[in-house]
């Protein structure tokens, strides 16, 4: 069974996501709930989407979870679940606005990852979007938009919210990666060996690398790299 996401993408139905969402609503109130009751509610939601093929969307499933929580008498949990959905929607809209203003769809992916890592309200993407909007101008270039976004994050940095500095660095890192990718494409640099050779010819790397390692070894070394470590900021 497939589910339609908000962006139109299709993903395979996973009832574990429903179970996790229900558990989080109880964690938010500190109320205990048995695994059997969670399973019961998951089954009820699952039966609903099985019986209604036209409603197999993330939005409709979440609506059903709300109703299911209330039907079982868990009103406080339903209230927090609704609030959580509202905040997530706010975050999503703020990120989409920034990506639209910068004309950069990949930027949305970066900001979604940031939002998942920095969940405190003080690091809301809504706050970033509002500050960014104060710097943005109609028709500005992609570079200017990214610069404005970095500036927005920097100016949000305070003793109470110091991680905005890290978030600005994450956006700066993304801009650098884009710049490097464009240069690699222009120069036709596809393998790690080609990149090392270019850097050596430019005098940025020492000759010792190419003198001590062959092309196959250097390309193999690239497999040990973990790009996601760039996100440790």
Regions from the language model: what does each represent?
Residues 1-233:
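Extended catalytic cores of very large enzyme megasubunits
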């Amino acid at each position: 069974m497939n589910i339609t996401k908000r962006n139109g993408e299709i993903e395979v139905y996973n009832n574990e996501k429903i179970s996790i969402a229900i558990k989080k609503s109880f964690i938010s109130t500190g109320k205990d709930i048995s695994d059997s009751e969670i399973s019961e509610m998951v089954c009820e939601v699952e039966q609903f989407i099985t019986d209604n093929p036209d409603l197999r969307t993330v939005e409709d499933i979440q609506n059903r979870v709300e109703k299911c929580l209330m039907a079982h008498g868990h009103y406080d949990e339903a209230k927090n679940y609704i609030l959580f959905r509202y905040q997530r929607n706010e975050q999503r809209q703020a990120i989409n606005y920034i990506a639209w203003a910068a004309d950069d769809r990949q930027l949305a992916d970066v900001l979604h990852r940031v939002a998942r890592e920095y969940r405190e309200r003080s690091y809301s993407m809504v706050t970033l979007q509002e500050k960014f909007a104060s710097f943005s101008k109609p028709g500005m270039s992609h570079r200017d938009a990214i610069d404005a976004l970095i500036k927005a994050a920097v100016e949000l940095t305070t003793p109470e919210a110091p991680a905005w500095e890290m978030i600005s660095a994450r956006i700066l890192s993304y801009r650098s990666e884009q710049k490097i990718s464009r240069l690699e494409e222009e120069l036709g640099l596809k393998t790690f060996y080609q990149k090392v050779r270019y850097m050596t010819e430019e005098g940025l790397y020492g000759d010792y690398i190419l003198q001590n390692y062959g092309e196959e070894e250097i390309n193999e070394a690239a497999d040990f790299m973990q790009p996601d470590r760039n996100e440790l900021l």
